[in-house]
Amino acid sequence: MFQTFTETASPDQGPPRLAALRKELAKAGLDGFLVPRADAHQGEYVAPRDDRLAWLTGFTGSAGWCVALRERAAVFVDSRYRVQVKAQVAADFEKIDWPETTLADWIGEALPKGKLGFDPWLLSVEQHRTLSGKLPDVTLTPVENLVDAIWLDQPDPPQGAVFAQPLELAGEAHEDKIARLAGKLTAKAAVITLPDSIAWLLNIRGSDIPRNPVPHGFAVLHADGRVTLYMDAAKLTGLGDHLGDKVTLRAPGDFLGDLAAIEGKVQIDPATCPVAVAEALTDPEEAADPCLLPKACKNAAELEGTRAAHLRDALAMVRFLAWLDLQPPGNLTEIAVVEKLEAERSATNALRDISFETISGAGPNGAIVHYRVTENTNRKVNDGELLLVDSGGQYVDGTTDITRTIAIGTPGAEETEAFTRVLKGMIAVSRLRFPKGLAGRDIDPLARVALWEAGLDYGHGTGHGVGAYLSVHEGPQRIARTGTVPLEAGMILSNEPGFYREGAYGIRIENLIAVEVAPKLYGQTVAEMLQFETLTWVPIDRRLIDPNLLTADERNWLNDYHRRVHDLLTPHLDAATGQWLSDACSVI
């Protein structure tokens, strides 16, 4: 079992740890200290050793900040976590809606002048620039991490074994990737900090970050077609000669010294480069991580692997959903749901890990967007409630992510209308043909129109990028108000509109989709059009759909989708599960 259900943090831990941190502030002569949920690699996910925000405050979400001052402290979270933070964080910390209120806004009011400490490995160049520009009277002071000074049982750095990703799944040899990217550099070299960028570039995988098959390390891509990899050699013993003569291995402790010795411009990505790295360079030049776009645009082998992973995952999901429908309401718990679903994925004999902690939210817990069930929060799945299940798997050929909201018993009229409006938004994105050059922010409103018509909305983005046996959240592509990167063929994204009634229920429907070139139409004047290929093939709960709210085109799309689900999966199912699927996919 990959997922566990123990409490990893508690509101009670925050006040004494905050008091200890304030003693460190006094010793260091500081007025405050920044605690981001970040590590030295500046990715979204962190190893247990680096989860300082959770250790200090009790908040376990995947994004957030704490600003600890001598008299005040605040935790900043986005819309996904505003219900969760209330339950996890003590009253000693103010709860701030971010980014509506930025760190600079709050600090400017709470600390107009003073010295604000930060760990230069945990703050990116871009973040530092933003804060220093908006807080001219606050001195940002780099210091050794003050949380580490009081975290006496801090876990050791992860040492997961590194292994090669087979060429038939990667689709391109790492030597060719290196040559292709190096040839485009305008600087002498580029620093790469993101673990998934390094893993993609070198066709390696690891296990240093839970649920993410990536190793910790740093890399420098040189314009002459070489890579210097900074990683503990003990983790690489299983690689053999995979890296070849284009990759030089160096100890992590050599990283900053080697950077300082490079003569000429060195490219850094200000969004992911720590201040400590930038300050080691003589002549830094800012540009995007050179791996981001190539990694996002999957090649034919990666797409084929992803399709295979989704078919395998869909069979596990359907077996789970068929089982779920047989369970009497009130006899089932959220934890039992997670255990059964993971068991079905494990039964494929291909599961390497789950791609994130399964969200199993019954009734009001479904309104906690990134809810993680524990032994303390576990509740029964009762008659008349909605059950929101958001889950995914890491397979060697692909990464999956799917959400289905299921009616337990007979749903109410309000829930049915809200679900159907969410479905209309998901269908609108799925059916879309659009001119090449549009970004995610141009598409995001289509997922919301049906909700807006009823005065409803959701706070999170509509879609995030997804890796190929890499991180389930991958940039730079996203379907959101902030999604400014044009979508390109080969990009994989989620399509997951939702609606959440705090204290009552949550609704989300999620498929993964891949951007592809659309066939030319007769009379087409746009040079190139794109469309989405659906990757996820699992039925959508018909009991929650009001057909009267669907247009003819929407009904046709849904019936075609369910026909495809039925035809793809039925040959691989036993008779009873096949009959359940046939009923679940019947025409609306």
Where are these regions (language model features)?
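Active-site neighborhoods and metal-handling regions in enzymes and metal-associated proteins
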Residues: 1-588
